Structure formats: structure tokens, C-alpha cells
Swiss-Prot record:
Keywords: Cell membrane, G-protein coupled receptor, Glycoprotein, Lipoprotein, Membrane, Palmitate, Receptor, Transducer, Transmembrane, Transmembrane helix. PROSITE patterns: G_PROTEIN_RECEP_F1_1, G_PROTEIN_RECEP_F1_2. It comes from Papio hamadryas. The lineage of its organism: Eukaryota, Metazoa, Chordata, Craniata, Vertebrata. Residues 1-37, 94-118, 184-191, 267-279 are extracellular. Glycans are attached at residue 29. Receptor for MSH (alpha, beta and gamma) and ACTH. The activity of this receptor is mediated by G proteins which activate adenylate cyclase. Mediates melanogenesis, the production of eumelanin (black/brown) and phaeomelanin (red/yellow), via regulation of cAMP signaling in melanocytes. This is Melanocyte-stimulating hormone receptor. Belongs to the G-protein coupled receptor 1 family. GO terms for cellular component: plasma membrane.
Length: 317
């Protein structure tokens, strides 16, 4: 994705020479000040991408194979897995091509590399946007299933879910193309940051409201069975811990990347901001880590999906 620092890694590798970079060390910024730079080895980056790729391929395969999983909720989960798959795959492709160019194993004209870089940028950006959208869609789906349980199947139908999925994909590709074309405009970067904050607020509000409703329900049961008061307290703590982990992982994995975009707008030349820009590859690695964690949170907790996945793996042998 075209941002400062590592945004033109493919194009820059045509004239670059490999240098030994420490995994964790101090690097000098433009003013000569020392700042902390965390380098992500290419091998680790590719390994994370491969793990994410395998996980999300398994999720998509299991949902496609089992007709019992062809419901709106699993439709959103499948599309989230597909988005995460594209995020990991596009970053792996860029890293692999870069390594081949740097090693001299792949010869290409600058114009060809530029076009390839643009295509990868669009895929990466659109898959990031769609991933955030599907995380929000899953939160909305769960909210409706709790607060409108009796009307859920009339509100969230499969045709509506498919239309929502199509709209998300089309909008993601369209806006990512515009973002890549006009990435050097501050308004474009601010739009991306505002979109991330909107998804964060949406998920936080919905999940907190769902937790409050669940605690109220557990409290009502505890009143009928006074002996279960301690169990109710434990449920509240467990729910709060789950919510903290869910939102915490989302913020920790996505937040640094959008902080990077924010600082490009606010302080592109400031020494402190320049230090943060040096860790762009780390921020991408965190997003890939989120793509690894998403199936664990949203997919593999389903007993039906795990059973189907087991059948798929056994059949493959």
C-alpha cells in the first residue's frame, strides 16, 4: 500500500542492494536522532502469511463444503476469511517478488514492476477494507440475533446477506482503487483512519451492549437460583475478559497501521514520526497476525465447522 517508507518496496528493489538489518536495534532518522526500529525478517513475514493463508483456506473450504453452514452468519465469516486470505497472499506475493528482484533471480522492467506494485496495492487495500467491513458485519449480525431473536430470520436473510457481501466487495475495490490513485492526498488517508475508527466504535458499542444484555439475563437467572450468584459473577468476568480480548486484539493489530497513516498527515517530517514510519513492515505483520487470529475467534469455535474441517482433512489424506 503506498505510504511513506516501505510503500514502493518493489520498485525500489530494482536499484537496491541487500543490507544486513538487525531484528531489533537503533536507527538514525533524518535529523540524526536515534530511534527504535523493529525489523521483521522476510522469513518470518512469509511464515506468518503462510499460516494465515492455510488457516483461512481451511475455513473457506469447510464452509463451502457443508450446506448446514450456508447461513448469513457463516457467509460473513467465510468472506472475512477470504479477505484475510487476500491480505496475507498479497503481502506474501510482494515479499517474494521483492526477494527475487533483490537476488537477481527475476528480471523485469521498472514499468512492469510499477504496474505489479499497483495491482498488489489495490488487492491489499481492498482486502483490508473488506476485512474491516466483515468484522463489523459479524458484530451487527450477532447484535440482531440477540436483541431481535424472534425476528432474526426475517431480518437477516441469505439473499440480504449476499447483497450486503456484494456491496462490501464492490465498495472495497472501488474505494481502494481511488485511495491508491490519490494516496498522496491527506484527505484520502484521513478517510481511511476515520473508517477504521468508525468500525472500532461500532464493534465496541455493539459488543458492550451485548455483554450488558447477557449479564442482565444471567442476573435474572441468579435471582431465581440464589446459589448461582457466584456463577453469575464469574460469567460477568468471563464475558468482560472475552470482550477485552476481542477488541484488544482488533485494536493492537490494526491500530498501529492506522496510526502510521495518521502521522503521515499530521507530522510527515517530524523526527519522532519518522521513527514510527521505519516500523511500517512491523505494522503490516501485525495485520497478518490478526488474519491468523480471526479464524480462531470467529470460525474454529463452531463445533459444526470443526467437524466439517476434520472431515475435509481426513478426506485429503
Amino acid at each position: 500500500m503506498p505510504v511513506q517508507g516501505s510503500q514502493r518496496r518493489l520498485l525500489g528493489s530494482l536499484n537496491s542492494t541487500p543490507t544486513a538489518t538487525p531484528h531489533l536495534g537503533l536507527a538514525a532518522n533524518q535529523t540524526g536522532a536515534r530511534c527504535l526500529e523493529v525489523s521483521v525478517p522476510d522469513g518470518l513475514f512469509l511464515s506468518l502469511g503462510l499460516v494465515s493463508l492455510v488457516e483461512n483456506v481451511l475455513v473457506v473450504t469447510a464452509i463451502a463444503k457443508n450446506r448446514n453452514l450456508h447461513s448469513p452468519m457463516y457467509c460473513f465469516i467465510c468472506c472475512l476469511a477470504l479477505s484475510d486470505l487476500l491480505v496475507s497472499g498479497s503481502n506474501m506475493l510482494e515479499t517474494a517478488v521483492t526477494l527475487l528482484l533483490e537476488a537477481g533471480a527475476l528480471a523485469a522492467r521498472a514499468a512492469v514492476v510499477q504496474q505489479l506494485d499497483n495491482v498488489i496495492d489495490v488487492i491489499t487495500c481492498s482486502s483490508m477494507l473488506s476485512s474491516l467491513c466483515f468484522l463489523g458485519a459479524i458484530a451487527v449480525d450477532r447484535y440482531i440475533s440477540i436483541f431481535y431473536a424472534l425476528r432474526y430470520h426475517s431480518i437477516v436473510t441469505l439473499p440480504r446477506a449476499r447483497r450486503a457481501v456484494a456491496a462490501i466487495w464492490v465498495a472495497s475495490v472501488l474505494f481502494s482503487t481511488l485511495f491508491i490513485a490519490y494516496y498522496d492526498h491527506a484527505a484520502v488517508l484521513l478517510c481511511l483512519v476515520i473508517f477504521f475508527l468508525a468500525m472500532l466504535v461500532l464493534m465496541a458499542v455493539l459488543y458492550v451492549h451485548m455483554l450488558a444484555r447477557a449479564c442482565q439475563h444471567a442476573q435474572g437467572i441468579a435471582r431465581l437460583h440464589k446459589r448461582q450468584r457466584l456463577a453469575h459473577q464469574g460469567f460477568g468476568l468471563k464475558g468482560a475478559a472475552t470482550l477485552t480480548i476481542l477488541l484488544g486484539i482488533f485494536f493492537l493489530c490494526w491500530g498501529p497501521f492506522f496510526l502510521h497513516l495518521t502521522l503521515i498527515v499530521l507530522c510527515p517530517q517530524h523526527p519522532t514520526c519518522s521513527c514510527i514510519f521505519k516500523n511500517f513492515n512491523l505494522f503490516l505483520a501485525l495485520i497478518i497476525c490478526n488474519a491468523i487470529i480471526d479464524p480462531l475467534i470467529y470460525a474454529f469455535r463452531s463445533q459444526e465447522l470443526r467437524r466439517t474441517l476434520k472431515e475435509v482433512l481426513l478426506c485429503s489424506w
